C-alpha cells in the first residue's frame, strides 16, 4: 500500500540523483490566477520518470539486482531505468517500439541500457518485455502501475509543498497515463 512514509523515504533516496526542480510563475497562461509550473523537464533525464524508476530499482533485493531489470517505454521511463540501473551497477534491458524517437533510443543506450526495438506499438513492446521477464527472471520495472514507482514520482508533491506551502490545487498531467492514487 502506498503511504506518505514511502514517499518521504523516496525523497531521502532520490537526493542522490534527482534535482529539486523549480516552480516558475506563469501568469500569462491563466490571467487572474497564481499559476506555477514544475520544471521537471530540467530533471537529470529531462523527465520526472527518473524519480520512480530510481526509487523502485533502489529497493530491489541483492538477488533481484543480480538478475537485472527490464522495462518497456517509448522514451522517458526508458532513460530513467537506464540511468538508475547503470548508477547501481545493474544490467538493464528496455523494450521500445520501433517508432520511438531516435533521440530517446540513443539516449537510453548512452545511459547504459540494452535496447531492443520491437516492431509495432507500445503494447507490443510491453508484451515483449513481459515475455523476456518470464524467460530471464529479470525484474520488470513498470512505468506507472507500481507503488514504489508512484512513491518516487510522488516526491514532486512534497517539493511543491516545500516550495509553495499554501498551494490550493495541483494539476498533474502525464503523457502515458493519468491516474489518481490515494495515500494514507
Name every feature range the model reports, one short phrase each.
Residues 2-5, 9, 21-24, 45-52, ...:
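Conserved active-site and cofactor/substrate-binding residues in soluble primary-metabolism enzymes
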Residues 93-94, 98-173:
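Small/polar-residue-rich loop-to-helix segments that shape phosphate-bearing ligand pockets
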Residues 31-42, 61-68, 136-144, 163-170:
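Glycine/charged-rich beta-loop-alpha catalytic/anionic-binding loops adjacent to active sites
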Residues 1-64:
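Positively charged, low-complexity intrinsically disordered leader regions
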Residues 50, 54, 80-90, 103-108, ...:
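Structured catalytic cores of enzymes that bind and process phosphorylated ligands/cofactors
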Residues 40-92, 96:
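Active-site cofactor/substrate anionic-group-binding motifs, chiefly glycine-
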Residues 177-184:
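Single conserved hydrophobic/aromatic residue that forms the stacking wall/gate
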Amino acid at each position: 500500500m502506498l503511504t506518505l512514509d514511502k514517499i518521504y523515504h523516496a525523497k531521502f533516496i532520490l537526493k542522490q540523483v534527482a534535482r529539486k526542480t523549480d516552480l516558475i510563475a506563469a501568469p500569462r497562461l491563466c490571467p487572474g490566477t497564481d499559476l506555477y509550473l514544475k520544471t521537471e523537464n530540467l530533471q537529470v533525464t529531462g523527465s520526472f520518470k527518473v524519480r520512480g524508476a530510481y526509487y523502485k530499482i533502489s529497493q530491489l533485493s541483492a538477488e533481484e539486482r543480480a538478475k537485472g531489470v527490464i522495462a518497456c517505454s517509448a522514451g522517458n521511463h526508458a532513460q530513467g531505468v537506464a540511468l538508475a540501473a547503470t548508477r547501481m551497477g545493474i544490467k538493464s534491458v528496455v523494450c521500445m517500439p520501433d517508432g520511438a524517437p531516435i533521440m530517446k533510443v540513443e539516449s537510453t543506450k548512452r545511459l547504459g541500457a540494452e535496447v531492443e526495438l520491437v516492431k509495432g506499438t507500445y503494447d507490443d513492446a510491453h508484451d515483449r518485455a513481459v515475455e523476456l521477464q518470464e524467460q530471464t527472471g529479470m525484474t520488470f520495472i513498470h512505468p506507472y502501475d507500481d507503488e514504489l514507482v508512484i512513491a518516487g514520482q510522488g516526491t514532486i508533491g512534497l517539493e511543491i509543498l516545500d516550495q509553495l506551502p499554501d498551494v490550493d490545487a495541483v494539476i498533474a498531467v502525464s503523457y502515458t497515463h493519468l491516474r489518481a492514487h490515494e495515500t494514507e
